[in-house]
Amino acid sequence: PCFLNYKAGAYGFRFSMIEASTEINDRMPEYCVNRIGHILERRFHQPLCGSRILILGIAYKQDIDDYRESPAIRLINSLQTRGAHTLFFDPYITSFQLEGKVYEGEDELTVELIRDVDIVVITTPHTNVDYGFVQRHAKVIFDTRNATRDIPDRSNIELI
């Protein structure tokens, strides 16, 4: 849609719906940071600052290893700016660079890793992740992609 909007602009046309959706998408990482903060406060009376957050999925789209333009990167940056400690697991991406710093992902999605964080945030719905396993061991999940839709026990799952 962005390319279509760009090309239309070159010919003097505007697609206000595309412009509005782009603006909403650009604000989504900050919206998610606020939601994560509210979930932590409401469920655990815990501030975002100092919380341990596992980001599940860095890739731009499911089942690929490309993180360029990934909203998960902006989400991590915003969370860290607000004092949260972030970790990530992505079966396709072992590390990424942000502002000259290299971020190393977790090697495995283990019971210990999931239990050790305050919240798991699903940002990329990879098909080779066992979300039932994550749900059984997480304190709470914030699912931004509805990856947990088939899990019957929703007591610790919050959707965007």
Question: Where do the model's predicted regions map?
Answer:
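Structural/interface elements that position substrates and couple domains in central-metabolism enzymes
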Residues: P1-I160
